[in-house]
Amino acid sequence: MSTADAPKKPRETDDVPVPATLRKSLKNRHIQLIALGGAIGTGLFYGSSESIALAGPSILLAYLVGGFAIFMIVRALSEMSVEDPKAGAFSYYATRYWSKRAGFISGWNYWFNYILVSMVELSVVGKFVNYWFPAIPTWVSAAVFLVIICAANLLGVSKFGEFEFWFAIIKIVAVIAMIVGGLAVIIFALPTASGIKASFANWFALEGGFFPNGLMEQTKDGTWTGLLMALVVVMFSFGGTELIGITAGETEDPRRTIPRATNDIIWRILVFYIGALGVIMAVIPWNTIGGDDVPSPFVQIFDSVGIHAAAGILNFVCLTAVMSVYNSGLYANSRMLYSLAKQGNAPAYLGKLNAKGVPVAGVLTSAVITAIAVVVVFVWPEFAFNYLMSIATIAGIINWTMIMFTEMKFRKVVAAGGAPEDSELAGKSGKEALDAIHFKLPFAKVTPWVVLAFLALVVVLMCFSASYRVAVIAGVIWLAILFAAYQITQAKR
């Protein structure tokens, strides 16, 4: 048979009936925007009001410190993803380089974390819808958007990538437009609703200056405020950046794409968090940010200068941001369940794919459980955001802790000559193997311990807040459940 007559290898797209496997259909532009979309959502557009109230202008330092920590966490994960790109990312890596127990705990905790994050997103959807239509119950909005995003995730990974790409584009354009608009208000001294001239000097002009609540201080009603307490809210905002690792198994060229997306994180933090909030606090006095009538400081900045149409547009952007994070969350959860099933740590049906390479059972299972948020929003609307966010934060910290420990285990295995057979590190050991790692974690002997110490500090700080204290207790109970569940599943085998 001639070369011309030889059957061509099917191309991995969602429209070609190739054998059921995860498709490597995500391109560089998808990965770049997915990484951005997963981290810019409720924490920035909605939760930033709370963090500003806690720390005032010094919140900018909190985002800088927290951003550095999360950047190093993603660098650690990306080090492994580049060498061994697999679906399930750190659950697979924890199993491969640490232990089966670690993989079980890491995978199920990540799934639990993103279930909670998804619930948080759904719990605030109604607030943005109510900006235009105050009569619509918040639980109705949550239910409608849950169905829409679930349907999008069933279309195939390339379709998911396109959805997320455009969601993220909307957010990027909007935040940049907000920054430019805010700078115009400052430069041209446009009048504001507060009557205070817009200026970066406002960071220092109000009572208390740049650190109005200090590093940490207790108010008369017993609550704690200050820069350190704001770190807790800040870390929730950064949840989702590790999604880069989850996408590695469905990325066309992970060795080129993953490092580029990872290194761009630091610029996203500087522009989209520090830059945006810095401009907002220059235009709006920080102690007037927030309130039930205006659900986000990003909306409030345009309301403050009388541009109500732009405020409505920003409210739409906030809504798409929430949908984007839930879209990413449902994607990540379905892939994690798929990976857990392939490892034997979840029911086998969750490891099955349809003809388009979509883990349908994982998508539907995660969506149904996330639907609990609709009930929570209906029954306890005020409870929903704060408590769900606090529990999601502790679950996220557990994830990040597992990633850092797994990275150290990964290096030990690689140094001992245990690199994957299909890796360029195969056959190498010791310093030669470690030097051959393509995308190294900077200062790898020290960085994991510095990050772990920082995460431990955040957990200690959580104990000073009533709602977060509940989350810490819930986190301990959740870990105990995971340990017990692993032992039970092993005993049955």
How should each PLM-predicted stretch be described?
Residues 1-48, 53-55, 70-75, 84-87, ...:
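Membrane-interface "cap" regions at the ends of multi-pass membrane proteins
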Residues 17-22, 59, 137, 169-312:
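Helix-loop-helix junctions that connect adjacent transmembrane segments
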Residues 22-23, 46-141, 145, 265-274, ...:
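Extracellular loop-to-transmembrane helix junctions
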Residues 86, 109-124, 233-251, 308-348, ...:
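Membrane-helix boundary/coupling elements in multi-pass transport proteins
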Residues 91-96, 101, 121-142, 174-177, ...:
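Helix-loop-helix connectors at the membrane interface of multi-pass transporters/channels
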Residues 92-94, 99, 131, 205, ...:
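TM-loop-TM module centered on a large, flexible mid-protein loop between adjacent transmembrane helices
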Residues 166-167, 349-360, 400-467:
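C-terminal membrane-solvent junction of multi-pass transporters and transport-like membrane proteins
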Residues 186, 384-399, 441-493:
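A generic transmembrane alpha-helix motif of multi-pass inner-membrane proteins
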